[in-house]
């Protein structure tokens, strides 16, 4: 059995933000989201989040999770004091307690799994996660006895110059045998530089204490300011990019590309520079995406090309070509082998297979059939100032350049709309619709000038 305590009560003053530190986003998730997600491999009995500064906002962000118990730390008097708040909640509990910090978002689930399983195999009263750092400044140092058992943890600010030379640091992640920790928590003191209750002091009262060293020291990096937040984002993206390149995806200029963990990519996909893939985006096989494109929560079929475009909450079927400079949004659905070209916006519309919308058009609340050709400058005028109205264009119909379709309106199959027309009435199948003023010519016209 293992219970979990996530320490999330700090003010995070170095973030210089009105937002609680654990609610700052690292990619697609908050810091607290990521810490909670790392618990997935574990069989957790109870999960506590200890809150303090702006605790109500932290609670609100996870109000949908009934498996999380929030515990208030009204005064921020140190990590030991935070865990003391669990005493009334875990009275009589006989399992282990895993303690994490809410601002250490890069820990992998398998690392926590190794820590907990190692602790339970060893029979130790406490097991801590450690790392070897080339620049350990700011981290507590871990000191072991001749048998390699942990005997002391000294916070960086309390270390002597000689003690600061020790590269083995405390990651701030612990697994305790709860009955043992419960017995010593009341003994913690504030006899230190910060006059706080350090959880690390409990180590001096417990025996035996073991350690598990993390293989990748980047996992333990904490976030205290915006610089560290940016550095953690870089590390996270390196992980994701490496994963996809090893899986058969080509990333041209990888450091200019960002990909959320929730994105799924097929094989032989090429991602060009300055492309950003977010949310629950799925991209099929043999696609070329970018450069300079943003795709969010969208499904892209096999063989699709996207250039310099913004796509959100939309679907694109196989072998279609999007862009450059297209904008698809609001549940746009593009069929197979379509072309959505330069400066075209498609919003809440369905475009049938092999339909071309090549340039300078807006399709809103529209349904287009198959093999439709939309001329340059065609606009669906879908909004009357109060409500949105639909436009329907049947199979194989064509709209001439600079046409305006005033919704609600239905264009039948095999219809031709003459260039420059403003259509505000339904057009039957097979018809030619012309709705423009007749051209007149005045020969020998003298253009007026301002000269008298």
From Swiss-Prot:
Cofactor(s), by name: Mg(2+)
Active-site residues, as the UniProt record annotates them: 359 (proton acceptor)
Molecular function in Gene Ontology: glucosamine-1-phosphate N-acetyltransferase activity; magnesium ion binding; structural constituent of carboxysome shell; UDP-N-acetylglucosamine diphosphorylase activity
EC number assigned by the record: 2.7.7.23, 2.3.1.157
UniProt-annotated binding residues for Mg(2+): 103, 224
Residue sites binding acetyl-CoA per the record: 376, 382-383, 419, 436
EC category: transferase
Gene3D superfamilies noted in UniProt: Hexapeptide repeat proteins (2.160.10.10), Spore Coat Polysaccharide Biosynthesis Protein SpsA, Chain A (3.90.550.10)
Source organism, top-level taxon: Bacteria
Protein's GO biological process: cell morphogenesis; cell wall organization; lipid A biosynthetic process; peptidoglycan biosynthetic process; regulation of cell shape; UDP-N-acetylglucosamine biosynthetic process
Subunit structure: Homotrimer.
Record's function text: Catalyzes the last two sequential reactions in the de novo biosynthetic pathway for UDP-N-acetylglucosamine (UDP-GlcNAc). The C-terminal domain catalyzes the transfer of acetyl group from acetyl coenzyme A to glucosamine-1-phosphate (GlcN-1-P) to produce N-acetylglucosamine-1-phosphate (GlcNAc-1-P), which is converted into UDP-GlcNAc by the transfer of uridine 5-monophosphate (from uridine 5-triphosphate), a reaction catalyzed by the N-terminal domain.
Recorded metabolic or biological pathway in which this protein acts: Nucleotide-sugar biosynthesis; UDP-N-acetyl-alpha-D-glucosamine biosynthesis; N-acetyl-alpha-D-glucosamine 1-phosphate from alpha-D-glucosamine 6-phosphate (route II): step 2/2; Nucleotide-sugar biosynthesis; UDP-N-acetyl-alpha-D-glucosamine biosynthesis; UDP-N-acetyl-alpha-D-glucosamine from N-acetyl-alpha-D-glucosamine 1-phosphate: step 1/1; Bacterial outer membrane biogenesis; LPS lipid A biosynthesis
Gene designation: glmU
Region (Pyrophosphorylase): 1-226
Compartments reported by the entry: Cytoplasm
Name of the protein: Bifunctional protein GlmU
Family from the record: In the N-terminal section; belongs to the N-acetylglucosamine-1-phosphate uridyltransferase family.
Recorded catalytic activity of this chain's protein: alpha-D-glucosamine 1-phosphate + acetyl-CoA = N-acetyl-alpha-D-glucosamine 1-phosphate + CoA + H(+); N-acetyl-alpha-D-glucosamine 1-phosphate + UTP + H(+) = UDP-N-acetyl-alpha-D-glucosamine + diphosphate
Region (Linker): 227-247
Annotated residues for binding of UDP-N-acetyl-alpha-D-glucosamine: 7-10, 21, 73, 78-79, 140, 155, 170, 224, 329, 347, 362, 373
Details of cofactor binding: Binds 1 Mg(2+) ion per subunit.
Region (N-acetyltransferase): 248-452
Keywords linked to the UniProt accession: Acyltransferase, Cell shape, Cell wall biogenesis/degradation, Cytoplasm, Magnesium, Metal-binding, Multifunctional enzyme, Nucleotidyltransferase, Peptidoglycan synthesis, Repeat, Transferase
A single cellular component GO annotation: cytoplasm
């Amino acid at each position: 059995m293992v219970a979990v305590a996530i320490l999330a009560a700090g003010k995070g003053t170095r973030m210089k933000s009105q937002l609680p530190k654990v609610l700052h986003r690292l990619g697609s998730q908050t810091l607290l989201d990521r810490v909670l997600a790392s618990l997935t491999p574990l069989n957790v009995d109870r999960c506590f989040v200890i809150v303090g500064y702006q605790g109500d906002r932290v609670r609100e962000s996870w109000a949908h999770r009934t498996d999380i118990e929030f515990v208030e730390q009204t005064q921020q008097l140190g990590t030991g004091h935070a865990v003391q708040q669990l005493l009334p909640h875990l009275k009589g509990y006989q399992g282990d307690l895993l303690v994490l910090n809410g601002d250490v978002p890069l820990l992998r689930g398998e690392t926590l799994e190794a820590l907990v399983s190692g602790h339970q195999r060893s029979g130790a009263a406490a097991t801590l996660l450690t790392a070897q750092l080339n620049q350990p400044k700011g981290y507590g140092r871990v000191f072991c006895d001749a048998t390699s058992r942990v005997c002391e943890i000294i916070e960086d600010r309390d270390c002597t110059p000689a003690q600061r030379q020790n590269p083995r640091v405390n990651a701030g992640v612990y697994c305790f045998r709860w009955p043992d920790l419960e017995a010593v928590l009341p003994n913690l003191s504030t006899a230190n530089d910060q006059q706080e209750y350090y959880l690390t002091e409990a180590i001096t009262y417990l025996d035996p204490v073991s350690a598990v060293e993390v293989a990748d020291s980047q996992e333990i990096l904490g976030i205290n300011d915006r610089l560290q937040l940016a550095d953690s984002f870089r590390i996270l993206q390196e992980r994701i990019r490496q994963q996809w390149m090893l899986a058969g995806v080509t990333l041209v200029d990888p450091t200019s590309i960002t990909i959320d963990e929730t994105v799924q990519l097929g094989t032989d996909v090429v991602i060009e520079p300055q492309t950003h893939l977010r949310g629950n985006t799925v991209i099929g096989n043999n696609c070329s995406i970018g450069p300079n494109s943003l795709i969010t929560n969208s499904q892209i079929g096999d063989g699709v090309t996207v250039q310099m475009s913004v796509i959100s909450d939309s679907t694109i079927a196989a072998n279609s070509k999007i862009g450059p400079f297209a904008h698809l949004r609001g549940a746009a659905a593009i069929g197979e082998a379509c072309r959505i070209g330069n400066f075209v916006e498609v919003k809440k519309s369905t475009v049938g297979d092999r339909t071309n919308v090549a340039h300078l058009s807006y399709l809103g609340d529209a349904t287009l059939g198959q093999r439709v050709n939309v001329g340059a400058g065609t606009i669906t005028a879908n909004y009357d100032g109060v409500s949105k109205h639909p436009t329907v264009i049947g199979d194989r119909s064509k709209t001439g350049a600079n046409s305006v379709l005033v919704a609600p309106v239905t264009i039948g199959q095999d219809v031709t709309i003459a260039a420059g027309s403003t259509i505000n009435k339904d057009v039957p199948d097979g018809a030619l619709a012309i709705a423009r003023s007749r051209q007149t010519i005045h020969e020998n016209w003298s253009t007026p000038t301002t000269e008298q």
